[in-house]
């Protein structure tokens, strides 16, 4: 699941931690490629129940042993969810997977999120797991940036997820990764880019031939730190309704550093 802004948007349905993945991504990513298994160990698959089976709908990031951050538009109070940690190839049971049910009362969507106004922002939600994750090589915590942190233009970040391989295409079995350089607010908010649809509580990345797509929603925008680690700076929110890789329409993410206080307060009170 990923949102699309109708006149030109499409929703993509992305704590202290370990930071660095076990293998750095390839610099040859263009439209996305298979990630190295378990190289993004905070990535989760959010799945919903239908007719007795569970289906992938969004990504997310494990930010505490019993908490996941995802997109607000990924959550519906009428659905039953589970989270799968330690997932890589969804078609194969590989061993590290941890399937954790979600109680209906443990879904916390940002109070200002408005499904009918994607461009208003606040597309973020927290999920409390019914039991704590068992951390290890395949399951680790994401690092989050300091409150208010803004990435410079062209910071080389990576989107990860099981979203569609191209507009209206299939969902992949294996976790995908793609290099998405940051597009700063000055550029992304220009009239012939996203214009006023982009707010300062968002971060843009990629555009042209690289982007997120349906199924990537809620998953992380992983950005490098000076010490060689990674921080989750974005939660995948929307792309263009004209297609997942429309020129001058970078993927738009909820900027995590704008919501650190809300994240901390929500976790502390539950």
From Swiss-Prot:
Glycosylation sites (chain numbering): 114
GO molecular function: peptidase activity; serine-type endopeptidase activity
Gene Ontology cellular-component annotations: extracellular space
Catalytic activity: Preferential cleavage: Ala-|-Xaa. Does not hydrolyze elastin
Record domain Peptidase S1: where: 29-268
Keyword annotations of the record: Disulfide bond, Glycoprotein, Hydrolase, Protease, Serine protease, Signal, Zymogen
Residue numbers covered by the propeptide annotation in the UniProt entry: 16-28
EC number of this enzyme: 3.4.21.70
Secretion signal, residue range per the UniProt entry: 1-15
Pfam families named among the record's database cross-references: Trypsin (PF00089)
One GO process term, biological-process aspect: proteolysis
Active site: 73 (charge relay system), 123 (charge relay system), 217 (charge relay system)
Superkingdom in the source lineage: Eukaryota
Expression by tissue: Pancreas. Not detectable in keratinocytes.
Disulfide bonds: 58-74, 117-120, 157-223, 188-204, 213-244
Functional note: Efficient protease with alanine specificity but only little elastolytic activity.
Family: Belongs to the peptidase S1 family. Elastase subfamily.
PANTHER family reported for this sequence: CHYMOTRYPSIN-LIKE ELASTASE FAMILY MEMBER (PTHR24257), CHYMOTRYPSIN-LIKE ELASTASE FAMILY MEMBER 3B (PTHR24257:SF22)
Record-given protein name: Chymotrypsin-like elastase family member 3B
UniProt gene name: CELA3B
